[in-house]
């Protein structure tokens, strides 16, 4: 007989009276007064199998099966008795009366129960094969697969061609650290794994392929965070002969269709916000618009106050002073406690802030006397009045302040805004709106100044085109040069980012010069690109989405590792296979590599 006629989770009342053959895993076995019930599981879900003692041979097998045994069942689909249906299962109205039961493979005792939700990540990643059997992980992986298929179908209909680009490429030490692969054939030389297929896809545009995509792995050897992996999957796209707005329109439609089809969610309109506005209002280039808190600009107000923390920042070059108004944060009942405020003070220090000044607005009508804070005595009346007026503060509100270099203020108070908005207090007091909040952030600066190295670096990458009319600013005032760059942001996560690229060799050389990459270096690192741009390169641009991030958002998973089959830990290790691991001396010799501090040989 066939090993399987149907998936367990797809057996419904449509099959009543039919004999089915199922193969799967024993999720649970229950002995109810002489009748044995087996919950049989496969990737599509569960079905209840009933084993009656009137078939003694089959019943003996049923008595011996345990959780996670791999078994095959042949039986009759019948309606469950009244009062025993389970509406949470597709198969909840039926059960399978077992006629034959074969153990395909027994299982040792599993390291954890499949329904245990309190497992440590170390346990889950060490026993990843078993973790992947759990319905939670199977749902995540199925959604990932369905989303990837839908993206491919969408791009295919839009005329995009799937072209693979090399995994072994040239190392260019711009941006994040490369993963290097030593060449055995070319002594002392190295390939790099791609951080993105950026230059290959641009050259495909020069080659006339017009619309390209691939769903591909990218690699970055950087310190990991909750939403980062050393290898990640990108939906990588490039187009020719489309302007910035046209490119954004295609991919906005793609993401909207994915959410509609996979989740039944209408993402609605995507507002567009400039980088400048996002940083000014929210201190972030990927603002979470679900949080209803905004910065109030106070730099000009604080220039002449006696409180040196504020006046010092207000008068320093590149300094900034802002307030963050927390409605209801100073109320006697239900406001933020002293402990919570102290916790937030420690929290902002992570981002370089030296502390967190605040004012409690107890009674606005009393002016200075209605405000509670050690800093009030050092701020003159006109400044206090302006603070209250600009923030729109009401009785019971709490005002937090940030004063430092602009980057520190934006990072620290921007993070505080999210922390307060997502807190229990924020959710109870209407400071957080539970919805999908997409937007485009556009008009990024072309360059930012690296203080440590005292040089300009590219905000996106050095192949991004400046806005029309901004080319000369690269020579005269790089800080004012705006790029044709855009990011799609959803709920405070950057889902995808892209730009219109430089398609003229002279402009590309100018950007390299602004980044302090001299002519010789340009030829050595990017000569092939500069050459390609001279052969009538078309205007082109594109975008790349992080598939892992997209699925994390769609599933509501707590970690990006919950949507990747075999992820790395935050220390870039694979706990299942124990990678990375030492290699033997012979392999190193073939690669012309000697370790400076060799590991002791394992015994």
UniProtKB/Swiss-Prot annotation:
Its EC number(s): 6.1.1.23
Keywords: Aminoacyl-tRNA synthetase, ATP-binding, Cytoplasm, Ligase, Nucleotide-binding, Protein biosynthesis
GO terms of molecular function: aspartate-tRNA ligase activity; aspartate-tRNA(Asn) ligase activity; ATP binding; nucleic acid binding
Aminoacyl-tRNA synthetase as UniProt keyword: yes
Enzyme class, first EC level, given as a word: ligase
Segments of this protein annotated with the region Aspartate: 198-201
Positions with a binding annotation for L-aspartate: 174, 220, 460, 501
Organism domain of life: Bacteria
Chief location category: cytoplasm
Record-linked SUPFAM superfamilies: Class II aaRS and biotin synthetases (SSF55681), GAD domain-like (SSF55261), Nucleic acid-binding proteins (SSF50249)
GO process annotations (BP): aspartyl-tRNA aminoacylation
UniProt xrefs under InterPro entries: Aa-tRNA-synt_II, aa-tRNA-synth_II, aa-tRNA-synth_II/BPL/LPL, Asp-tRNA-ligase_1, Asp-tRNA-ligase_1_N, Asp/Asn-tRNA-synth_IIb, AspRS_core, GAD-like_sf
Substrates-to-products reaction catalysed: tRNA(Asx) + L-aspartate + ATP = L-aspartyl-tRNA(Asx) + AMP + diphosphate
Intracellular or extracellular location(s): Cytoplasm
Site annotation Important for tRNA non-discrimination: residues: 32, 83
Entry similarity comment: Belongs to the class-II aminoacyl-tRNA synthetase family. Type 1 subfamily.
Function of the molecule: Aspartyl-tRNA synthetase with relaxed tRNA specificity since it is able to aspartylate not only its cognate tRNA(Asp) but also tRNA(Asn). Reaction proceeds in two steps: L-aspartate is first activated by ATP to form Asp-AMP and then transferred to the acceptor end of tRNA(Asp/Asn).
Protein name: Aspartate--tRNA(Asp/Asn) ligase
Originating species: Acidovorax ebreus (strain TPSY)
